């Protein structure tokens, strides 16, 4: 009969902590409407409207949120401009001691990495790169079923300019506490 000796330190998978619970109200399935500022999509770009959907799910035993965003952008007279798509992955990075996210979209295409923090009812991410310009993404909870989402940029590292802002409505029940 063979007896296996247990090593003193077996590897173990990471476990989701309270930081992931704190993200739950922000990462739901949403639909939204809003507007893109003139010059928001680059110099000379017109004001536009946007309507979109987000679908988010927990993956890897609750360690990460995996989200897909899709938005139709139109001129203010209703003419179609483009369909924006973005894939978003976020969670608590224990090594850095902060929220981290990465995104890939079809408008650059760009692959970006962000650092995040929760400030009360606000979830704020800023581009991790130290160079300029930088992006800031903010989710603001306006109640159990509503939020505002803002996208801003800075050219100097101090003053932030609004690119776009949306009123969001949850399309699924609130997470249980």
State where each predicted segment sits.
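Hydrophobic small-molecule pocket/channel-lining residues, especially in calycin-type beta-barrels
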Residues: 1-177
């Amino acid at each position: 009969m063979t007896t296996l000796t247990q090593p003193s330190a077996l590897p173990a998978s990471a476990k989701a902590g309270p930081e992931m619970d704190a993200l739950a109200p922000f990462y739901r399935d949403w639909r939204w409407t809003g507007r893109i500022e003139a010059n928001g999509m680059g110099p000379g770009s017109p004001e536009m409207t946007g309507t979109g959907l987000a679908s988010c799910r927990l993956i890897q035993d609750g360690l990460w949120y995996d989200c897909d965003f899709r938005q139709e952008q139109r001129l203010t007279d209703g003419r179609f401009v483009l369909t924006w798509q973005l894939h978003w992955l976020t969670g608590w990075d224990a090594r850095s001691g902060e929220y981290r996210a990465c995104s890939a979209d079809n408008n650059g295409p760009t692959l970006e990495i962000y650092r995040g923090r929760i400030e009360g009812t606000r979830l704020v991410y800023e581009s991790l790169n130290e160079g300029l310009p930088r992006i800031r993404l903010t989710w603001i909870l306006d109640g159990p079923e509503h939020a505002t989402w803002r996208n801003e940029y800075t050219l100097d590292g101090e003053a932030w300019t609004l690119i776009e802002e949306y009123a969001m409505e949850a399309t699924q029940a609130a997470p249980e506490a």
